């Protein structure tokens, strides 16, 4: 069963095309890496797949729903780690997750468990603005999994995570459908079964089995 089906996804910023005619089909439980240089369109594609942005044209179905019409319903089923963590710097790590619990209708008892999973129990009371870049990234990842989403959309989640970052991501991705943007081909090869290469907003060929991409 395909969790994501995209046809002709195109996005313009003014007179500049950021994404052009992208077709995708991603099955349940599949992990796909999106590769490309800066400005290739990776972030734009992931924001659209996370329902954080609308394409200028094209069709997108996620979990059988029209993603352009059912964004609110789908956001409860999608975990999104954006390119920037997007945390509340004055709130503690715990308070950031508790606030998200309130928005998503998640039990706050899950907060301590989630902080432990991402390795932040010892800094639970520290303001997010005082955390290191790697810790902030871990907190953003924790927020993305707090509501146990079926689909994870991760924009360079490995940034500043440290030596055990790949292990953390592998554990969190298990049993979920994942779209992951990264510059790290070794990480993509370890975590994903397929890759989509973007160049100037266009797909370079069709999504490929990763062992063919060097």
Language model regions located:
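Catalytic Walker B motif of ABC-type/P-loop ATPase nucleotide-binding domains
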Residues: 152-156
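Conserved ABC transporter NBD signature motif
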Residues: 58-66, 74
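Conserved ABC ATPase "signature" region
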Residues: 98, 102, 108-123
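Helix-to-loop junction immediately C-terminal to a conserved catalytic motif
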Residues: 50
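The feature captures the beta-strand-to-loop junction immediately N-terminal to the Walker
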Residues: 35-37
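Conserved structural motif at the start of ABC-family nucleotide-binding domains
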Residues: 4, 19-21, 75
């Amino acid at each position: 069963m395909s969790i994501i089906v995209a046809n002709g996804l195109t996005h313009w910023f003014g007179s500049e095309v950021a994404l052009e005619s992208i077709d995708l089909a991603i099955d349940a439980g599949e992990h796909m890496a999106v590769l490309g240089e800066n400005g290739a369109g990776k972030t734009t594609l992931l924001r659209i797949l996370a329902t954080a942005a609308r394409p200028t044209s094209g069709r997108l179905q996620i979990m059988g729903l029209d993603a352009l019409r059912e964004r609110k319903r789908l956001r409860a089923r999608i975990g999104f780690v954006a390119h920037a963590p997007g945390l509340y710097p004055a709130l503690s790590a715990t308070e950031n997750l508790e606030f998200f619990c309130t928005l998503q209708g998640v039990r706050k008892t899950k907060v301590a468990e989630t902080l432990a999973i991402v390795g932040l129990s010892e800094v639970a009371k520290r303001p997010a603005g005082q955390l290191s870049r790697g810790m902030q990234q871990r907190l953003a990842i924790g927020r993305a999994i707090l509501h146990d989403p079926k689909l994870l959309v991760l924009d360079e989640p490995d940034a500043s995570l440290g030596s055990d970052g790949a292990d953390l991501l592998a554990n969190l991705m298990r049993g979920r459908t994942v779209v992951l943007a990264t510059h790290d081909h070794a990480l993509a090869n370890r975590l994903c079964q397929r890759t989509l290469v973007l160049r100037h907003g266009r797909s370079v060929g069709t999504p490929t089995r990763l062992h063919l991409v060097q």
